[in-house]
Amino acid sequence: MKTVIALLIGAAVSARLHAQARGGEWTTTAGDAQRTAWVRADARLSREAVQEGQFRFLWKMKLDNQARQLESLTQPVLLSNIISYKGFKALAFIGGSADTVYSLDYDLARIFWTARLNTWPVKNSTVACPGALTTVTRATPLGQTGTAPGPGGGGRGANNNVYVIASDGEAHTLNPQTGDDLVQPVKFLPPNAKAMGAILIDPILYASTADNCGGASNGVWSVDLGHPAKTVSTWETKGGRVAGTAGPVFGTDGALYVATADGEYSDSTYSNAVVALDPKTLAVKNWFTPGRTPFTTSPIAFEHGGKHLIAAGNRDGRLYLLDSASFGGSDHKTPLDKPAPYASVLGDFNAGALATFADPDGTRWILAATGGPVHGDTKFPAANGQVINGAIVAYKVVEQNGGPVLQAAWVSRDMAGPVPPIVVNGVVFALASGEYRTTDSQMTAAQRAKQSKPAVLYALDAATGRELWNSGTTITSFVHAIAPSAGDGQVYVVTHDGVVYAFGIPLEH
């Protein structure tokens, strides 16, 4: 018995050291519950390492997924430390649009398991409503990405489980070691609903829906997977779609936030707004609206100077900064700040999400992508060449007249159709998607794909926007609305043709 106990203690200690060496984890869309897209700590990946030439292409893997319209693979979520039946493993979980989930051993660049979900054939698939698996998550803490995880035991107890919403609307809880359903799938959304940004704040699973696909109302959905009844709760916008690509956002004050796009605009609807919801009941707590101008990104949430702040991007080319305590004031229309537009082609600001981070000095930054030239009314102190097709722009959160405001800081080099950026240890990773973007609803997915170009990944200095590295011609297809994810010294890109690319700093074995 003493020998067994000693072995168990040794394994636990080894797992803890293994986890601490590898850094934090990307567990959900945009990395964490606040959707910051920021990995705070990484043991290997840093600005200095990139400048020294250590960052490079590592591997690529073609998955046997069949794209549905423009949907293909989901943003990878990571489990950097699990004690599996094959020993210590570092896994990436990726959903395929054709209702398949893949687990990749990213140290060895091998498929660990494949799970094919039992769903009905999709009928009447369209570009707007593809009838696809579009989101995968793990259990996510309310804090931010970048602290070392505990030892992963797998199975039910440690809740390293993988949560997936299939195209038929059922929520699956998959064993991270095998891909098997741990429990009976739960009826969550209507079949063929367009789910975005699934996130599990244990034991409640949340997701947003858009475009009224499958008859699912635009809004936010939740189900308590820990309760026997598995009752589903819903909040409906009664107007515009939920904006952006990151889904529901948990503020640092504990409330749930979503932004909404264009739709019926009246006192009984929540179009063109940022809305605060109670996370337990999904009842509306407060809202802000700038008027008849729709939001185009999911919000981000962060704490600054003792305030719980929210930011979101709008089709008018502006960022809106909100204080969760006042949230637009008594008229619901007064933000903390809305600087001059930075997107000159209004409506092209459609990357879907933002990113935020704090530098070592404590300065808070907000990053956004624009799909066209930068607006002349915004003067960025640091520029990195002429912008024609799009770029990443950066703002600092500074104090002015006793309150926080946004101060333009830098604009990156020109990029073709950038998706939302991510941040790791002072490095901004920006992906020029290469996707042909159009407002022509009659244009098919195949026609759009034909006019798209290969994506390019860029590494930028987070302080200046200066280019440190790029992937050149390594990537051979475009990316549809999926930002990279990162962790454990690596950055992952998924392309429309079903290929996963890994870039990073090689792990010494």
Positions of PLM-derived features:
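Predominantly extracellular/luminal regions of secreted and cell-surface proteins
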Residues: 21-47
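Sec/Tat signal peptide C-region and signal peptidase I cleavage site
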Residues: 15-19
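Bacterial N-terminal signal peptides
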Residues: 2-12
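Mature, folded catalytic cores of secreted/periplasmic enzymes
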Residues: 13-14, 480
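Extracytoplasmic/lumenal domain signature
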Residues: 22, 43-70, 80-90, 99-132, ...
